[in-house]
């Protein structure tokens, strides 16, 4: 496997074939984004990563996130689980014993969380 990140991501994306390279880049970026939101660096769960993915997508794409993800081959939260576990298998991400691909199944519906009036959690006004 190549040594630089971009080439490694390309290899993983090509080996699987279901998702665009940009989906892999975005998941990697979302992991970094999510970890930076923590007070103390630690392992994050699949659900925590999905929350970070949602917030980053709202920041970057807003209501167009569903369309962007669709172009990349992502149609449900389980697709992010497939990408994460492809990266785990390539030793580009780590997992704990408790982590499972199923942690990503049906966590939220894209059409519900990526609406025009949706904002990342950090940008919402307090209730």
Feature-to-residue mapping (PLM):
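Non-transmembrane, aqueous-exposed alpha-helical and coiled segments at domain scale
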Residues: 1-127
